[in-house]
Design a protein with these regions (language model features):
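A short, histidine- and acid-enriched strand-loop-helix "catalytic/donor-clamping" loop
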Residues: 12, 111, 126-138
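Nucleotide-sugar-dependent
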Residues: 13-17, 207, 262-266, 273-294, ...
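Membrane-proximal helix-turn-helix segments that form the acceptor-binding/catalytic region
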Residues: 22, 86-94, 129, 136-156
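Carbohydrate-associated surface elements
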Residues: 162, 177-181
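A charged, aromatic-enriched C-terminal amphipathic alpha-helix characteristic of glycosyltransferases
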Residues: 178, 332-371
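Conserved donor-binding/catalytic core segment of Leloir-type glycosyltransferases
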Residues: 189-207, 212-218, 229-231
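Nucleotide-activated donor-binding/catalytic signature segment of Leloir-type glycosyltransferases, i.e.
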Residues: 232, 239-262, 269
Length: 373
């Protein structure tokens, strides 16, 4: 059993993302995880500072001086780094992490970690295009953080090919794509019931309503007994815009947060990813939720996302034939694609990502993790 210290800009209670998935992957492999959550503003006192969330998982909370998107000047980076570094040092004194713990860093601005862990293996995972997300009219302050963080790391991973290419100017990053947290499950082969297209994600302004409405129009004309289901929670205030955008369309239903297995999987013909073009979407190579959908045997219909991985069962809604050709493709090939989907899920099992990260399962968990292959 080994110890892993994870640094993130995420609360453990948030919707699961790659930070949570890596933590769970390590826990299931029999290791201990110390999960440093997103720092609170300096005027707040996070409580408890250290919390045993469950066996093997310790949540650790710190504070910072400035939000990572707002450090416009290098001295602001220095001041914040000194403050956060002191916070981390104090928290480590009350944690029982081993001195040789492996560090997995998801914070693009924690370039100071080498001062804290001089001899440790530090793995940095860049999971977003932070420069594109800059809240200021320039991104040089973010590039400064990224460069220094990459250069101090033992290894760097990127979650998409565009991010991987961006980071090459400072390091030799490897590609870390999402993996399937559950094994492939063959869908019921009753095609007569499959008349439902499902979007399962955040229902907000990231959805391209023009694409959704084109699908709705096509179904109304060509497949009047088919429906669209938009399922998920909302970040911010974008839900009302979605509701307004699909109002009056009888073949579209919007639901709140629902677990995937609570949906009528035997009625779903394909999953939807109808996203708007944006810097964040343009850099996506494989979305986290996609692997969960593939594990249930569902093909995927996507729009925009030019860097998305190419597979026969990932069909573009903005391709040559438009939404009609995409819908026809999943209707004609759903069963024929299952062997390819099953193989893709197996090739992206948890054990493959452990090996990529250079992590061995603890002896007590080795059989369970290897068995997932």
């Amino acid at each position: 059993m080994g110890d892993f210290i994870l640094f993130t800009h995420t609360k453990w209670s948030e919707a699961p993302r790659i930070r949570h998935q890596v933590a769970n992957l390590l826990l299931e492999a029999g290791h201990r995880v110390f999960f440093f959550e997103r720092p609170s503003p300096f005027w707040q006192s996070p409580a408890p500072a250290v919390e045993q969330a469950r066996p093997g998982l310790t949540l650790v909370r710190t504070r910072n001086l400035f939000h990572h998107q707002l450090r416009a000047l290098v001295p602001m980076h220095w001041l914040n780094a000194a403050f956060v570094e002191s916070q981390i040092r104090r928290r480590l004194t009350v944690c029982d992490a081993c001195a040789d713990a492996t560090i997995i860093n998801f914070a693009h601005d924690y370039y100071f970690l080498r001062r804290l862990f001089a001899k440790s293996r530090i793995i940095t995972i860049i999971h977003d295009d932070f420069e594109a997300q800059s809240r200021l009219p320039f991104a040089s302050h973010i590039a400064w953080s990224l460069e220094h963080t990459c250069r101090m790391s033992s290894e760097v991973f990127a979650v998409s090919t565009p991010l991987q290419e961006r980071l090459r100017v400072w390091c030799d990053p490897k590609l870390l794509l999402p993996w399937s947290v559950v094994p492939y499950r063959a869908p019921v082969p009753d095609m007569a019931r499959r008349k439902l297209l499902v979007y399962w994600g955040f229902v907000d302004s990231a959805i391209d309503l023009n694409v959704v409405c084109r699908i709705s129009d096509h179904l109304h004309e060509k497949r009047p007994d088919w429906r669209i289901l938009l399922v998920g929670p909302t970040q911010g205030s974008g839900r009302q815009a979605v509701l307004d955008g699909v109002a009056g369309r009888a073949n579209i239903e919007v639901r709140g947060r629902t677990e995937l297995d609570e949906l009528p999987l035997d009625e779903i013909i394909a999953a939807l990813a109808p996203y708007r073009s944006s810097p964040a979407c343009d850099s996506v190579t494989l979305a986290n939720k996609s692997m969960q959908l593939f594990a249930r045997g569902l093909p995927l219909l996507i729009s925009n996302m030019p860097s998305y991985i190419q597979q026969p069962f990932i069909v573009r809604l903005d391709g040559t034939g438009g939404v009609g050709a995409a819908v026809d493709a999943v209707a004609a090939n759903f069963l024929a694609w299952q062997s390819q989907i099953e193989r893709f899920v197996a090739d992206n099992a948890p054990a493959t990502r452990l090996r990529l990260l250079g992590v061995e399962p603890a002896a007590s968990a080795a059989g369970a993790v290897v068995g997932r292959l």
